[in-house]
């Protein structure tokens, strides 16, 4: 009888893809896989960790300790750990948590299966076990990052940027379409750098255009672009291809030249304003999601005022913000004193988010009375929950449609009349099924 393996995936969607790849390999080798179990159901547990920021490290360590206790109590047989945390802190972790049967990094996790299976190991690249609802999936197009922003530990963990071969990505898309996937959320640590490590040129627009031309691909959504040397031909693809969502996730981090220089972002205030302006001009209706940081070392009141004015001007449809926290080994940790008091960081964070909350409420209210294409994700209580092309899974607003109104099908598209809005969610009524 085959053993059951629980894969516990922590952190970002890029980690989730790694977990799904491992699950596909496990199943091809005769194991039954479950995922994200609160109560371990399998004889073997694999924890895929995140090591990006302190909160993520704590979550990863606590999860490992939880399953180490389960092993001590005899509720599971074996415990393995993989991912970013073990990639960065392997020696310390091995010493501190001896209950773990095997430690694997971010890139050698396939060795885990070889160690379990021995000579009978079967390789089957590309056969992912999708853990999201079947109608959408994440497509990881590269690993690593060459940008070396002052505050970021990602290059220390994942190394240099490595683009996946374009045909390999397109083959994966075709395979997922055959499995029922309609929506593809393209992810990378630095999306717009795709291809540079191969031949010195950015090929992201070419890749997305070819994905859009693949039969069965209904939506493509782009995540984690970078403002420096932004490839403007990508905007043409977003504008012209109907199945490329008018949505772009691009972390801008700050606007003052002082902060951008200290952060080693290699972009200026003027260039950032021009980038946002061109996005709005070349792709009418585009929804921009960005991430900002407050409290970086040396941030003055004047720097923060510039940031507030930028947010008011840009009117981002989606925005997240974080207070700076020092990450060991990064340029900022080694070169700068963390000199902005915690209470000032929190105050600035609260202020910038209040500005954005008002903007978000106003922009969502403008959708009332419009008919939008919505994909249905799930039934929850009295409502079917869906998303428009402007909404990425997990992080963006959702559309709530009364379940009593009509029987909708999970994973199908409907034209929905938006009838009301809240700060982060919309309410609607179905007009017609579109796909």
Regions found by a protein language model. Give the residues of each.
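Conserved SAM/AdoMet-binding glycine-rich loop
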Residues: 77-83, 88, 93, 178-304, ...
